[in-house]
């Protein structure tokens, strides 16, 4: 477990890293690439992602609470059970990622792209009854 609180990362590549339980809380991640990383139970709380991407990462049960992810490139990630409460995720495309059991703020879902199955799951989480 590594704790990198309030750090600045620019043009960093995290490739096949094991970041389980690590904390990047309140850090700036600018032009960073996370590729094929494993990091369940990690914290990206209140992080700011600028021109960054996450691809093929397994980050189940991690926290992105209050993070600024707007427009971050997301592809084929596992976000199962993650906390996105209060996060700015506008413009993010979760359609190729697993978000089973993830928690989102209702207001944050505007302009977020999800696939059909994810839309049904999110509707249930929001208390909608689909008939």
Feature-to-residue mapping (PLM):
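Tandem repeat scaffolds
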Residues: 1-131
């Amino acid at each position: 477990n590594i704790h990198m609180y309030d750090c600045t990362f620019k043009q960093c590549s995290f490739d096949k890293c094991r970041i389980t339980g690590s904390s990047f809380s309140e850090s700036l991640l600018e032009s960073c690439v996370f590729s094929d990383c494993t990091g369940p139970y990690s914290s990206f709380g209140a992080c700011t992602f600028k021109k960054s991407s996450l691809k093929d990462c397994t980050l189940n049960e991690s926290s992105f609470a209050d993070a600024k992810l707007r427009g971050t490139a997301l592809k084929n990630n596992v976000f199962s059970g993650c906390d996105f409460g209060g996060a700015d995720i506008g413009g993010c495309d979760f359609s190729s990622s697993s978000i089973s059991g993830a928690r989102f703020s209702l207001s944050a879902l505007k302009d977020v792209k999800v696939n059909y199955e994810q839309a049904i799951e999110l509707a249930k989480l929001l208390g909608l009854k689909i008939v």
